[in-house]
Amino acid sequence: MILFCVFAFVKGYAQTGQDDTKVYKKRVLETTEIDFLTSYYSQDGDNAAVTGGVGTEELTDVTGTFVVSIPLNDDDVLTIDAGISAYTSASSSNIDPFDDGPADPFQASSGASSSDAWANLTGSYSHSSDDRNDIWSAKLAISSEYDYFSVGVGGTYSKLFNEKNTEVSVSGNVYLDTWNPIYPTELRPFGAEGNGLSDRLFTQNTITGNTDYNPRFSEFDSKGRNSYSLGFGFSQILHKNLQGSLALDFVQQDGLLSTPFQRVYFGDVADSFIDDFQLADAVERLPDSRFKVAAGGRLNWYINEVLTVRTFYRYYFDDWGINSHTASIELPIKITNKFKLYPSYRYYNQTAADYFNPYEGALSTDAFYTSDYDLSEYSANQYGFGVSYTDIFTKAHIWNYGLKSIDLKFYQYDRDTTFSSSIITAGFKFVLD
């Protein structure tokens, strides 16, 4: 039903625009296109940040996205991107591990934090000059989930010259985000309006180990997180079979960069438990600013009609002490005029952030601390395989929309920690007849 309504709306709008416009030059986008994208993602591991670097990281996520591109005239294109993501998470369920049966960091608990939905709506507009050598674009994005809201604006300018063999671009984005902080259950009684160990949680449960439980906790003053990015791009056709590109990106983040529900355990504080669950000594505390720089390049080599080689490398560093390298290769293989295969491989490694410590590695005297293994030192390998089907004549139809292409891909990702994940993606492109 949703798909039918989207098709109906776009068809009516597009036909009106096409009827009123006389075509004197090649359009940037010939006709309305609709992409439907979906994915299924799963992960697991034993270093959950929610439980201080130990415990299950099990999570599953299902997404669905519509991307509608509408030619407004010869030069202008409006694109609307609407998506939703629904996940269930054993690790985030342990924000409140005391709601159903014995508490254990390696077992999921039930409750509101065990699942959530993320929704996103992005609108973008692009304009191309008559000679197609200048392209301007702007976007507005809004996304929301239970404890987070984000609004963003951005723009890009691209210039082509040297008979369109060379392209330079500059882009900028601003995202203004707001947290609705959710803290681990056992820490909430120690907030500004809490009553400490007199809270119902502690009177109805028995604390073992260190019974004089006294965490280091205060609620965050700031709830905002702002991100500002500036990017530069350069692309050059080096040969009829070879194309290269370079990119340089800068990101500045300010505000609440800590995740309020991620626990930390101190090595110099005696452990306190309810059931098998260790009570938090604190929540993650990170600096309120972060500066990131990434520089990379791509080289695509068209070997022949059957095989293409796509390579990528990026170096990244920030002022939290992380340095990383990413290298990847993809080998599109043309099987027939309609089918292609896409084997790929990506390697990644990074150093640890200055503020990372494993379980009970931080001290209560530290100013900043986290046990989020995304900020740890690790290496990762990702293997992928995809298949695409393309029908330029769009023989298959849904209503007045022809099916132009189908893309299916699978990726397996493994770190040298206990973390691993996999994702299956599917994309379907339709064009208006």
Residue spans of the language-model regions?
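Outer-membrane beta-barrel translocator domains and adjoining extracellular loop/strand segments
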Residues: T21-K22, D46-G52, D81, S91-P97, ...
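Outer membrane beta-barrel transmembrane domains
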Residues: D99, F106-S110, V251, L256-S289, ...
